[in-house]
């Protein structure tokens, strides 16, 4: 680990910045700020408008797009309101630029100093490609809300969100490979359960994106049952014609799936912990499992509260941030059962 300390710090710094970016992205979504910047320029958008005249010009450009014409024009939407939503989208993109610099500049330095072995270099090249693709996905998502509908595609939003989580998890995995270079005997049953758990968490993140994109957290604000005391609410059937659409495009169906997967995630983590009692575990493995139990309980509780209180900004942001911590802990635990 000592020989790779600077590389490890670099990778973990990247993880932290991705975490911050996704939290800010959550605020951007929950404050309806994501469509405030109607174009994308790598250099000229680095700073927000610096004069009142430039603000007026940018605001007038925003007025040409569906979100203003179909929604905000009816809400006495002022330049001051616009500056608020512009800030969050600008800040989200600004952090993305910082992440790019934080990755590329040290990467070049490590290349020159030959601090990256062939395997780590290959993994970092993959990370570079993932970062570039994530930037494309961000604009691809925003573009969907600038044409006809004054909202982004929930499919594109979920793709953008989920890929950020995956990029974070892979960056953490690369760092863990350097922190724990030694090999040990793999406990196959526990590793396989941990893999399934990680996959289900990724699926839950996808549906979390669907819920956010469709504003599906604003309906059926009851727990443990949906509205009218129903486990499977009739609106799931009525909203869409096909079963696929009901569970990918219908608000009630998407929320039902998100609710249901939460039970599977919690159950798998409890099952993994129970199965681990039959094996001799390392300290890192025990710590990972104990942390998972605590975090999944907190996240489950946050999810219920977010639903019951109709997604207040602060709860929605904390719920998304805790999903990151749950993913990080699952990734760490899987790594400790895999290497």
UniProtKB/Swiss-Prot annotation:
It is a multi-pass membrane protein. The keyword Transmembrane applies. It comes from Flavobacterium psychrophilum (strain ATCC 49511 / DSM 21280 / CIP 103535 / JIP02/86). InterPro entries: COX15/CtaA_fam (IPR003780), HemeA_Synthase_type2 (IPR023754). Its EC number is 1.17.99.9. GO terms for cellular component: plasma membrane. PANTHER family: CYTOCHROME C OXIDASE ASSEMBLY PROTEIN COX15, CYTOCHROME C OXIDASE ASSEMBLY PROTEIN COX15 HOMOLOG. Heme binds at residues 258, 319. Belongs to the COX15/CtaA family. Type 2 subfamily. The chain crosses the membrane at residues 7-27, 92-112, 126-146, 159-179, 199-219, 254-274, 291-311, 312-332. Interacts with CtaB. Pathway: Porphyrin-containing compound metabolism; heme A biosynthesis; heme A from heme O: step 1/1. It catalyses: Fe(II)-heme o + 2 A + H2O = Fe(II)-heme a + 2 AH2. Catalyzes the conversion of heme O to heme A by two successive hydroxylations of the methyl group at C8. The first hydroxylation forms heme I, the second hydroxylation results in an unstable dihydroxymethyl group, which spontaneously dehydrates, resulting in the formyl group of heme A. It is found in: Cell membrane. Its cofactor is heme b. One of its GO terms (biological process) is heme A biosynthetic process. This is Heme A synthase. Pfam families: COX15-CtaA (PF02628).
């Amino acid at each position: 680990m000592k020989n790779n300390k600077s590389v490890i710090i670099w990778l973990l710094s990247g993880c932290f910045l991705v975490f911050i970016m996704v939290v800010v992205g959550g605020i951007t979504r929950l404050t309806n700020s994501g469509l405030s910047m109607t174009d994308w320029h790598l250099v000229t958008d680095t700073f927000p408008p610096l004069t009142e005249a430039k603000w007026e010009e940018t605001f007038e450009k925003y007025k040409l797009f569906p979100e203003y014409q179909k929604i905000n024009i009816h809400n006495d939407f002022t330049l001051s309101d616009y500056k608020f939503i512009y800030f969050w989208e600008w800040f989200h993109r600004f952090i993305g630029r910082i992440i790019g610099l934080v990755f590329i500049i040290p990467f070049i330095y490590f290349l020159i100093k030959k601090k990256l072995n062939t395997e780590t270099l290959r993994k970092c090249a993959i990370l570079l490609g993932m970062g570039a693709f994530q930037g494309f996905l961000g604009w691809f998502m925003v573009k969907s809300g600038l044409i006809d509908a004054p909202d982004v595609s929930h499919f594109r939003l979920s793709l953008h969100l989920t890929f950020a989580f995956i990029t974070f998890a892979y960056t953490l995995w690369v760092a863990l490979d350097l922190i724990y270079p030694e090999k040990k005997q793999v406990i196959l049953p526990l590793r396989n359960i941990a893999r399934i758990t990680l996959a289900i968490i990724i699926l839950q993140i996808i549906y979390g994106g669907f819920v956010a994109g469709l504003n599906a957290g604003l309906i059926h604000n009851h727990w443990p049952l949906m509205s009218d005391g129903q486990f499977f609410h009739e609106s799931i059937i009525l909203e869409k014609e096909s079963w696929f659409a009901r569970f990918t495009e219908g608000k009630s169906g998407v929320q039902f799936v998100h609710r249901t997967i939460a039970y599977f995630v919690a159950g798998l983590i409890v099952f993994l912990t129970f199965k681990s009692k039959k094996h001799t575990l390392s300290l890192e493995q025990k710590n990972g499992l104990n942390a998972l139990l605590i975090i999944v309980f907190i996240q489950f509780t946050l999810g219920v509260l977010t639903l019951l209180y109709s997604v207040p900004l602060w709860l929605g942001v904390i719920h998304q941030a805790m999903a990151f911590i749950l993913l990080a802990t699952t990734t760490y635990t899987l790594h400790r059962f895999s290497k």
